[in-house]
UniProtKB/Swiss-Prot annotation:
Any Gene Ontology biological process: ribosome disassembly
Gene3D superfamilies membership: 3.30.230.10, 3.30.70.240, Elongation Factor G (Translational Gtpase), domain 3, P-loop containing nucleotide triphosphate hydrolases, Translation factors
NCBIfam families given in the database record: EF-G (TIGR00484), PRK12740.1-3 (NF009379), PRK12740.1-5 (NF009381), small_GTP (TIGR00231)
InterPro entries listed in its UniProt record: EFG_II, EFG_III, EFG_III/V, EFG_IV, EFG_V, EFG_V-like, EFTu-like_2, G_TR_CS
Function in brief: Catalyzes the GTP-dependent ribosomal translocation step during translation elongation. During this step, the ribosome changes from the pre-translocational (PRE) to the post-translocational (POST) state as the newly formed A-site-bound peptidyl-tRNA and P-site-bound deacylated tRNA move to the P and E sites, respectively. Catalyzes the coordinated movement of the two tRNA molecules, the mRNA and conformational changes in the ribosome.
Pfam families found in the cross-reference section: EFG_C, EFG_III, EFG_IV, GTP_EFTU, GTP_EFTU_D2
Xref: HAMAP family: EF_G_EF_2_B (MF_00054_B)
Protein name per its UniProtKB record: Elongation factor G
Amino acid sequence: MARDFPLERVRNIGIAAHIDAGKTTTTERILFYSGVVHKIGEVHDGAAVTDWMAQERERGITITAAAISTSWQDHRINIIDTPGHVDFTIEVERSMRVLDGVIAVFCAVGGVQPQSETVWRQADRYSVPRMVFVNKMDRTGADFLKVNKQIKDRLKANALPIQLPIGAEGDLTGIIDLVANKAYLYKNDLGTDIEEAPIPSEMEEEAAEWRYKLMESVAENDEELIEIFLETGELSEEQLKKGIREGVLKHGLVPVLCGSAFKNKGVQLVLDAVVDYLPAPVDVKPIQGVLPSGKEDVRPSDDNAPFSALAFKVMSDPYGKLTFVRMYSGVLSKGSYVMNSTKDAKERISRLVILKADEREEVDELRAGDLGAVLGLKNTTTGDTLCNTDDPIVLETLFIPEPVISVAVEPKTKGDMEKLSKALTALSEEDPTFRVSTDPETNQTVIAGMGELHLEILVDRMLREFKVEANIGAPQVSYRETIRSSSKGEGKYARQTGGKGQYGHVIIEMEPAEVGKGFEFVNKIVGGAVPKEYIGPASNGMKETCESGVLAGYPLIDVKVTLVDGSFHDVDSSEMAFKIAGSMAFKDGVKKCNPVLLEPMMKVEVESPDDFLGSVIGDLSSRRGQVEGQSVDDGLSKVQAKVPLAEMFGYATQLRSMTQGRGIFSMEFANYEEVPRNVAEAIISKNQGNS
């Protein structure tokens, strides 16, 4: 089957921004003008094509990155609409990994918001070329040039207006195209009747000034253009387009456009700019990967190269499991067998589809540069590489942040236990930042995610999609106990009941073990003081006592026990008697070994604008945190600290409020450390029921 569009005429783009900048409305208008939908869907009416989950339509926010294919000016445009809420960062992250270009949408009133900075950093991480659409120019307080300055100052971007608005707020009547040096005037509400006109006389001077700046900036990056510009003081429309495209692809130039998606103004010009300035798959660097030999290799965007693709999203739906893939090289055919090189597993491709949000079109094959979805994959999860069995390669994977909040979950009825388990498995397959584990001590199921809204929506999905009602508990900290000194312990169990008695007797030495050893047992019995068959039961008795600790009922770790002596009775001794004696000796010894309470310490890294550095450090210190490092780079501060997990609950919300939503943090387990005496006393007292 031949290609519908040559690779040079394919654009894989994302639409990304902060909440309420108008991303989804912009996507809806793009679909309307490019003919995918025939009626405009509004986010606030709950009718947007890309917001296809029930929760998205209710809340008016985009949660999952919906992938849609459309066409414009004889180009195929694959679009991903991404969420702006920080709890759904993984959706933006995985979009950036597979895109070639991004339209960053900003509100003309709100300008650069905290989430804009996060999204911009994610685009930087994957070196994604981008352009800007300053939306909502019809709103009171809209200021195009102010937003352009914020993008330059706060995002350190080489932002360059290629348009100017004619009028603003309720009086936005048209747009000046600085590249073509003319105006577009809107004659109807649908934005379909557009008149080309000369630049209005009252704006000629301002437009000439901005066009000169545009020519100057574009010429700076191109030797050929700078010569022409220095000689003639002018660049033609074609020369400007070529220069802007080169600047976007290579030099970090960011063209800035304006309009109002809601009022249907400026969207077709955004589509023109996508075609003119954003890269095709052949314009970006070939994807890198690692061969089985360990050698690095690249795969060019070419149908004739060996097949390789990256799974960037897994979704359950009524028809089965959909795995979204970005094709990097070669051709993937329906019914073929491929290799999951990340997991070293063979997979069969049952069906292939291209998505138009919640509608789908079945296709026989996907080619290099395509975004599509596969049905039938059993073992593939987010970040896995698919390739030919004859030409294995593992592509660079996604950066997946660690979850930062966890809570216990249980079904409201016993009968829902199995349904809950299935729901959690399906949801964790879809979302790599959603983790499920079982607490061995409480036997509770614990779910972890990127924030409270993240977990709230997942619990909501359990109810809607899997019909499971669940209770959510407060998160618990898993403390531990250990000993700080050495001692001896003795346990003698002697009972006489009727005929046969019970007798077991052991003497042990206890000392702290190396960190990470858990429970270590050494047998030093000589001369048969304790027969061999009773040594195992005595050790088991000690190990079981270890599990419930001596201070507050938490497991005892890193303890070394040496069995040195004991005695037995030919008739009355038994395995049970020695198990009880072992437990008694352990309890006797541990009390004399200075037992202490340990708590999990977390490695925490906080990123925020440097204005908030003092507040961030002060807050971490108030949480018993130890700051281990800090740096400031380009107005962004990073703080590394070690903080007790018990003090980190509610931190995501506190950080947001403290940094006006502009701070992000990651957290992972570091080690166990001793709990300060005053804190330990409160925990012990509470667990012993004295509080």
